[in-house]
Design a protein with these regions (language model features):
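Glycine-rich phosphate/dinucleotide-binding loop and adjoining beta-alpha-beta core of small-molecule
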Residues: 1-144, 212-219
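Alpha-helical transmembrane segments in multi-pass membrane proteins
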Residues: 28, 32-34, 152, 160, ...
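Short, small-residue alpha-helix embedded
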Residues: 95-98, 152-183
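Amphipathic alpha-helical interaction elements
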Residues: 101-102, 168, 189-192
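Short, well-structured alpha-helical segments that form the helix of a local strand-helix-strand
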Residues: 109-117, 173-186, 197-205
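Glycine-rich phosphate/pyrophosphate-binding beta-alpha loops
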Residues: 148-150
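Charged C-terminal helix
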Residues: 186-219
C-alpha cells in the first residue's frame, strides 16, 4: 500500500541532503528514526547543523556518535543559535554520556540530564516514566503524566515529530520539548491501554481541543 498524503523526497547522501536544505523552507529536521547507525548518519547530522537548521536527534542519530560523542557536541556548539533537542532513552543515553549512566549511583536523573545538557550544548530529553528535560542554561522539568502503556515501539518517533512540529512553529527548544512530552503523554491517555504508535497521531487532535477549550480559543 501507499500513504499518498505524505510527500517524500529520497535523500541518500549528505550531499543530497545539503542540496535539499538549500531550500530555506525546510527549517526543522528530525534525524535518527530508521536512519541506520554509521558515518552516513553522522554526516547527515553534521550537514543539518552546518546548515543551521532546528534539529531533533533520536535513535540511530545518537548511537552513530557513540564512539566519539565529542564530535557531535562540537558540531552542536558551532551551529549558532538554532534549536537542537536530543531525545535518548536510558539505553541510548550512556552511549553519549557514559559517565552519567544510571548504573553509577549517587546522581539523580535530574542531575544527570542537567549535566548532559550543559556538556553537549543542546536540550536533552531523557525518556522514561518520569521523562526529564534540561536545557544548557540549567532549566529543567520532569513530566509525570505518561501512562505505562506509552512504552511501545515507535512512540518515541511520534514524540520526535511533535517536538519538531513545535520547533517549526518557532517554539524555543526547551519549551518545545516540555510541551511535546506533555502532549505525548496526554495523547496516550486519550488512546488508552493497548495503543500502538499510530494511535497517538489519531488522539492528538483531542489533546489540542482540550488546550484550546482551556484557553478559550475558537477552532
Amino acid at each position: 500500500g501507499a500513504l499518498t498524503a505524505v510527500m517524500v523526497r529520497p535523500v541518500d547522501t549528505a550531499v543530497e541532503f545539503g542540496e535539499l536544505l538549500g531550500d530555506k523552507r525546510y527549517g526543522t529536521c528530525i534525524i535518527g528514526p530508521g536512519a541506520g547507525v554509521g558515518e552516513r548518519t553522522c554526516d547527515l547530522v553534521h550537514t543539518a547543523l552546518g546548515a543551521q537548521r532546528h534539529l531533533v536527534l533520536d535513535a540511530d542519530a545518537l548511537t552513530s556518535f557513540a564512539a566519539r560523542p565529542e564530535r557531535l557536541f562540537e558540531s552542536i556548539k558551532s551551529s549558532g543559535d538554532k534549536a537542537v533537542v536530543l531525545t535518548p532513552h536510558e539505553g541510548e543515553f550512556p552511549r553519549l554520556f557514559s559517565d552519567l549512566s544510571n548504573k553509577f549511583p549517587g546522581r539523580s536523573k535530574l542531575e544527570r540530564v542537567r549535566t548532559a545538557a550543559e556538556r553537549c550544548g543542546a536540550v536533552v530529553l531523557l525518556k522514561g516514566p518520569d521523562t526529564t528535560i534540561a536545557a544548557p542554561d540549567g532549566r529543567a522539568t520532569i513530566a509525570a503524566n505518561a501512562p505505562p502503556w506509552l512504552a511501545t515501539a515507535g512512540a518515541g518517533d511520534v514524540l520526535s515529530g511533535i517536538i519538531a512540529g513545535l520547533l517549526a512553529q518557532g517554539v524555543p527548544a526547551f519549551e518545545a520539548a516540555s510541551i511535546g512530552v506533555w502532549m505525548h503523554g496526554e495523547a496516550a491517555r486519550e488512546a488508552g491501554p493497548g495503543l500502538i504508535a499510530e494511535d497517538l497521531t489519531e488522539t492528538l487532535p483531542a489533546v489540542h481541543r482540550r488546550i484550546y477549550d482551556a484557553l478559550g480559543v475558537e477552532y
